[in-house]
């Protein structure tokens, strides 16, 4: 039928299957290279918010996070005052965890320093892989790691720079979310 796209339900897509928001994320964003500092900062913040929770929970709250945090404009987030951050504790659209909310400002300020040092957040991030995407080319989801030497090194460096909620596992998910790591299975049509 014209205009209808048939999507194969490979094992790769199984973690997103049945939820339109998760499917859209899998198909259009996950493991897709994106060199935009704002987008990379958004993913860093959303991944940090997901600590101890499911990614599905955070994706379903993404619009509220965008509204609350100035669409992740780095400079605006870095300049947020305590009163504004405290007010977000009342926003039912967010995970109302003070440390996670305040981490957005802390991480934005760290990203600003990185931008001054490297020219962009993107250049800093890609410096950990010499500008090359890590393509796992896995055959099964059971092969996909949750941490790597790169995520450990990046996590360590981001922590040294004062960032919060950037452990090596979350950092690995972050690397997937911005396309530095491509963990779509080899048979996934969204590689």
Where are these regions (language model features)?
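HhH-family (HhH-GPD) DNA N-glycosylase catalytic core used in base-excision repair
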Residues: 2-191
